A protein has these predicted regions:
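Acidic, mature catalytic/reactive cores of soluble proteins
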Residues: 1-364
């Protein structure tokens, strides 16, 4: 749930009446609208009636984006920090950003989808209506990444994205900072910044704190075996990699960023995606001493010849040393490491840029 990913213990429940606007939950719905739009465009090739449905989903995405990126002191996007936060709204009209640097602030990146030229041509009425809507309501276009005539990227690609270029750079500068989100083993669910700077929130006379906890949770929430305050979770890492690849199809080599932050090492977004995938893969590989980070201090699994080569797909992983934590049979989502190995094993940046998304699933 959104309140889990945000890293704090549903403190909003103790602030009744009042409600929480969740940046991650809103981003999920924006991504859902994009996915449904893509499917409707595919179906419209065979049944034109689906073009109206595609128009509906495009409109939903734009309205969600306007709500999420609204300018103001109480919106989800904090222009000063260059980051997204959940917002707690109270009956008196006041609002408080819950300034936890968590996965909540990264997930808006995931609502990103490139629009190929052939897709626009397949639904000309939708394309025309969208551009007309931008003309009549420029605030819609201003709330998302620039797109449309004069704003197409590589190979005339358009883009539907919640996060524009300037915000993208600011969010990535935190995400790729090894003192914040970037672990040797992937992207942490909570910034390491909170190890030295815990977030404190008061509700009805009680303090709620969010500390960086790279391993097990220190609360009984959700059974006590779920922790979004520092560990590495494979499914959200995979979604972030997907988003970076979408942005790369639009920008190509015209967008580069330091990875890691302050290293001086400039990468395009395909290279950044591959770097994160390599770090996730490192969880399961033997290090120079022959030990696999995934097995942590479990000596039986590390050294016993009958066990050491039989990998376990844990629920999540220690944010600093990569050790597996939680259920050890979470193959459904932790198994995503396998297609990441496959995709980056056969795909290079140029082939991907020229061939588009289909190239990721082609061999030879």
């Amino acid at each position: 749930s959104g309140s889990t990913i945000s890293g704090y213990s549903t403190a909003a429940r103790h602030c009744r009446p009042g409600y929480l606007e969740q940046a991650d939950g809103t981003a999920w719905v924006a991504l859902y609208s994009q996915n449904m739009l893509e499917m409707a465009v595919e179906l419209a090739a065979h049944q034109p009636a689906y073009e109206d449905l595609a128009t509906n989903f495009a409109g939903q995405f734009l309205l969600i984006a306007r709500a999420m990126n609204g300018i103001g002191p109480d919106g989800m996007c904090d222009e000063e920090d260059g980051f997204y936060y959940d917002v707690l709204r109270l009956p008196n009209g006041s609002a408080t950003r819950l300034k936890v640097r968590s996965m909540v602030g990264l997930l808006p990146l995931c609502a990103t989808t490139v629009v190929e030229k052939w897709q626009r041509e397949r639904v000309p009425a939708l394309t025309a209506r969208t551009y007309e809507r931008f003309r009549r309501m420029p605030e819609l276009l201003e709330s998302i990444h620039a797109t449309g005539p004069g704003q197409f990227g590589v190979a005339d690609r358009g883009i539907l994205a919640l996060v524009n270029e300037s915000r993208l750079r600011r969010i990535l500068s935190r995400m790729l900072d090894e003192n914040e989100f970037l672990s040797p083993y992937g992207i942490r669910a909570l910034s390491r910044y909170h190890a030295e700077h815990p977030y404190s929130f008061w509700a009805q006379g009680q303090e709620y704190r969010v500390n960086y906890l790279p391993a097990e949770s220190d609360t009984g929430m959700f059974g006590g075996n779920s922790n979004w305050r520092g560990p590495i979770w494979m499914p959200v890492n995979a979604l972030l990699i997907r988003a970076l690849l979408q942005y790369y199809l639009y920008y190509g080599d015209n967008f580069k960023i330091e990875c890691p932050t302050t290293s001086g090492n400039m990468m395009n977004l395909f290279e950044v995606a591959r770097e994160i995938a390599n770090r996730l893969t490192r969880i399961f590989l033997r290090d120079p001493t022959g030990r696999r980070p995934v097995f942590g201090g479990a000596e039986k699994f590390q050294s016993d010849p009958y066990w050491r080569d039989h990998l376990l797909f844990y629920e999540y992983f220690h944010g600093d040393n990569g050790a597996g934590i939680g259920a050890s049979h979470q193959t459904g989502w932790t198994g995503l490491v396998a297609p990441l190995i496959e995709i980056f094993g056969h795909l290079d940046a140029r082939t991907f840029l020229e061939g588009g998304r289909e190239a990721a699933f082609q061999h030879g």
